[in-house]
Amino acid sequence: MEIVIRQTPSEVGTTVADIVEGYVRRGPTTLGLATGSSPLGSYRELARRHRESGLDFSDARAFLLDEYVGLPKSHGQSYFSVIRSEFVDHVNLDPGHVLSPDGESSDIAEEGARYDAAIAEAGGIDVQLLGIGTDGHIGFNEPGSALTSRTRVKTLTEQTRLDNARFFDSVDDVPHHVLTQGLGTISEARHLVMIAFGKGKAEAIAAAAEGPLSAFCPASVMQLHRHVTVVIDEAAASKLQLADYYRYALEHKPSWQSF
């Protein structure tokens, strides 16, 4: 695991965009896209590079981490619609090459297995972007999720539904269930890139990177992965015991070694 500490959230977004651009410029790439506030700066920077420098996403495809059960893709708050408005519609990534779990599937119990099979058929995910919750969750894998879990239906906590109610007309309109990639599914991506900033994420980052491997902190599953880059700002790094070493290692990173 490589931990990259930047001064500001803007620098975090630039570094993550650098990583994604490296993959895209090397050829056909399968991206794992996350929603939420953490990757927004990275998406904006990638869109700017497409607009101003011609960064080409025409050979890329993408898979989303999760989707609400019961919402059509056309709904403004479906994660498919959100990722289009936040990123896909601002670059030349074919929306037909962007896949999400089907929250309207006629066999919702089997949709997770179908989605995992679609990822495998595409050759797997090259680089997966991830946020992290204050409780260490990634995707909708809340504390207690099995570290080897697959894409499946999860029940939203009442607090999560209340938190998301601001995006809907009322809390009654917020779905009770989501389809989310499991921790085992996420771990099969070849490169995991976690994004976090702000003091509110400091304890979760410390638990994920330096704490015990535990279902209590789902993001700690990254400790078992062979290629993880955690890109955070100084505030999110404030609880890391080895922060000075991470800064030292980055300062002396060989010029030939990419993220």
UniProtKB/Swiss-Prot annotation:
Top-level taxon: Bacteria
EC number: 3.5.99.6
Single GO cellular component term: cytoplasm
GO terms classed as biological process: carbohydrate metabolic process; glucosamine catabolic process; N-acetylglucosamine catabolic process; N-acetylneuraminate catabolic process
Keyword vocabulary terms for this entry: Carbohydrate metabolism, Hydrolase
Catalytic activity: alpha-D-glucosamine 6-phosphate + H2O = beta-D-fructose 6-phosphate + NH4(+)
Enzyme type, top EC level: hydrolase
Transmembrane parts of this sequence: none
Known pathway: Amino-sugar metabolism; N-acetylneuraminate degradation; D-fructose 6-phosphate from N-acetylneuraminate: step 5/5
HAMAP family noted in UniProt: GlcN6P_deamin
The name this protein goes by in its record: Glucosamine-6-phosphate deaminase
Classification of source organism: Bacteria, Bacillati, Actinomycetota, Actinomycetes, Mycobacteriales
Gene this protein is translated from: nagB
